[in-house]
Amino acid sequence: MYDVGNELEDVRFYGGEYGIISSRTSPGWPMMMVDTYFEGQRKAAVYSKEVGFAIVNMHVKNTPVAFEMAENLADRLHVENSLWENISEAGVRVSVEGNTFSQLNLVNVDCRNVPVLVGYAQSGKKVAGKAKMYRVKEFTYGLVYQDLNDASSFREICEIEPVAKLPVTLGKDLPVLPAMETWVNIRDLGAKGDGETDDTEVFEKAVSLHKNIYVPQGWYRLTRTLKLSPGTKLIGLH
């Protein structure tokens, strides 16, 4: 995939030199990526040119680098609740050091056969993993404040612990949508969504008869509290 947008979820990438290659998003907002799987890339799972990724539930397997920052470009990266396996060169390759825009945060990242967690391209420094299997409770590189009254300084915070067991797969952070053939469109049931018509009765009847109700974009006017039964879902897409 070339040049991502601002949000990506529930996707899988197999093979290729890279799973994702991307430059800055438009209009320069961060990129949120949730519930992704990468396997067998020849160079890196993700190659970023100043994107500013925020990543949750990223499973990477059998590739030299999980995340690579483009040469001579500072970048921001936050990775949380992820699993990296068989990463031969480095979990993260940091391109630029000592730059205010270089920010790296890893939180609760499980690693299996990842001998180098972070490699710094400029200095050649490497942060080694603690064992064959380990958990990164916290890793931070960038400007760090001890408290609000102190000046910031470039620091590296590393809290890694060896573990005896790691998960084989990751569960999903986002709920799985019900099958689309089970959806009922609230507009087909008579809702207007024009900001003026009172759609309360349509919604009340819909939730009493259906479990999965799709609500297209609009301004739906409700004048009473809508009470949902257990398992009833209102589905909106952006």
What spans do the regions from the language model cover?
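Extracellular "leader-to-stem" segments immediately downstream of a signal peptide or signal-anchor
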Residues: 1, 6-10, 14-15, 22-40, ...
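N-terminal extracellular ligand-recognition/capping segment immediately after the signal peptide
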Residues: 200-238
